[in-house]
Amino acid sequence: RPGGKKSPPPPQPIQVKVNQIGYKPDDTKTVIVTSKDDEKFKIVDAKTDETMFVGAYGELSYDKSAESNVRHGDFTEFKTPGTYKIISSPSGASYEFSIGDDLYDDVYKDVVLMLYKQRCGTEVTKDIAGDFAHEACHMQEATVYGDTSGTKIDVSGGWHDAGDYGRYVVSGAKTVQDLFLAYEDYGQTADDLGIPESGNKTPDLLDEAKYELDWMLKMQDAASGGVY
């Protein structure tokens, strides 16, 4: 800038890629580097910089999803719980990541609470949703377009979708399916997410799924069985 300080250079993208949440001890663990020059990598303790593991990258290959040439390094055999980063020369360091058994507890809660924050047709409270809190919304009846009789139906409820106020049966049904699968696999006892229904002796995953299902039933035409 004329007469001012020079702007700092833009930050360089991290070239050493890991799962930033981390890995369970027995998970397959892979590091990816977007450079042809890196041959080896080392895992260092994030607090002490002590080298904990040394590994080698495989051959350079094209990753279609990344649209880039990459090299993969495997560190599955390293299982020690802790917080680490990977140093790779000449590309630099990865973000910090962890190895442990409870890594996904907070992620699970964040995902399900996100659905609560997207609830439509009810107050979403600040003590649970923070900045996403809002009053009950979209409570008015909606016109069925294409129906010449002027039919209006109650479509309150469900989840807002995709960062706006749209609500859709198809994407809602897929999300409900995912909640049911998560319940079958992991969630029979999960009743501590802090949503209004918590503590009602029904797992919170099912409570959240029911909130969407109640809306989906409103979206079903009684005569044809089809959905709006």
Name these PLM-found stretches.
Residues 5-12, 16, 94-129:
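Low-complexity, Pro/Ser/Thr- and charge-rich linker/hinge segments at domain boundaries
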Residues 88, 176-197, 212-219:
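Well-ordered alpha-helical scaffold segments within catalytic/enzyme domains
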Residues 44-46, 52, 58-61, 111, ...:
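Catalytic cores of eukaryotic secretory-pathway lumenal/extracellular enzymes that build
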Residues 110, 114-171, 195-228:
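Extended ligand-binding groove/face enriched in aromatic
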Residues 1-2:
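N-terminal Sec signal peptide cleavage junction
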Residues 38, 70, 81-83, 94, ...:
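Extracellular structured ligand-interaction cores
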